[in-house]
A protein has these predicted regions:
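Short amphipathic alpha-helical coupling elements at transmembrane boundaries
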Residues: 6-9, 56-60, 125-133
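Hydrophobic core segments of alpha-helical transmembrane domains in multi-pass membrane transport
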Residues: 24-28, 44-49, 76-83, 105-109, ...
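Cytoplasmic-side transmembrane-helix entry/capping segments in multi-pass membrane proteins
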Residues: 62-75, 96-102, 129
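Transmembrane alpha-helix boundary signature
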Residues: 81-96
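Short, membrane-exposed interhelical loops at transmembrane-helix boundaries
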Residues: 157-179
């Protein structure tokens, strides 16, 4: 049950983005299209899971005064590995993500889970916690990217889903909502998701 909670809790009840309000900056940068959002979410999940695993394995041998430095070194090493992997196998997406892959090092979700969970729990539990929080983060990125790409470009994962015949230029009634491609719309969509989520979860509402 504990393992299941580690995986499913961050998807909704304890989501790192819409409940803990962490990792918001990525929602602006990489959610114009679903493909880079998916790759960024997957990258953060891998880094979070393995950072948790490594730090949980090392937790009893690290002096508390240097633990932050060790955490940063571990996270940075994992991010470099992920970055090189993306450049080798999905170069086009890597170019779209640009510097934002490197900025995973500064993602509050990763450091937060290492500090709050991995340093006090067993390796396997910590690994699952990282997977769960990564999935929760990726889910929000994909939801935001879904609306931005669909209404801003008329496509999903780069595939046109709104028929050309619908567009005004072809005698139809529809026109892409260009404002959806601007960064502020990502925050507005995240805000809407938070509002809907809290409306259905009374425990999260402030008294």
């Amino acid at each position: 049950m504990s393992n299941l909670k580690n995986l499913t809790g961050p998807l909704s009840a304890n989501n790192p983005v819409i409940v803990q309000i962490l990792g918001i900056c990525s929602a602006l940068a990489v959610t114009v299209k679903m493909e880079p959002a998916f790759v960024m979410g997957l990258s953060v999940m891998v880094v979070t899971a393995f950072a948790n695993l490594v730090m949980s394995l090392l937790r009893n041998g690290i002096p508390s005064r240097i633990r932050i430095i060790v955490q940063l070194v571990v996270i940075a090493a994992l991010v470099i590995i992920v970055d090189q992997f993306l450049k080798a196998f999905v170069y086009d997406v890597s170019k779209q993500l640009s510097v934002y892959v490197g900025l995973i090092i500064t993602n509050c979700i990763i450091m937060g889970r290492v500090e709050a969970y991995a340093l006090g729990n067993k390796p396997w539990d910590s690994f699952l916690d990282g997977i769960g929080n990564g999935l929760g983060y990726a889910a929000i990125l994909l939801i935001v990217a879904f609306f931005r790409e669909l209404f801003g470009s008329g496509s999903l994962f780069g595939i046109q889903v709104i028929p050309d015949s619908w567009y005004i230029a072809n005698g139809g009634f529809y026109s892409n909502v260009g404002i959806m491609l601007f960064p502020p719309m990502a925050l507005i969509i995240v805000g809407a998701i938070i509002w809907v989520h809290r409306s259905f979860n009374k425990d999260l509402q402030e008294k």
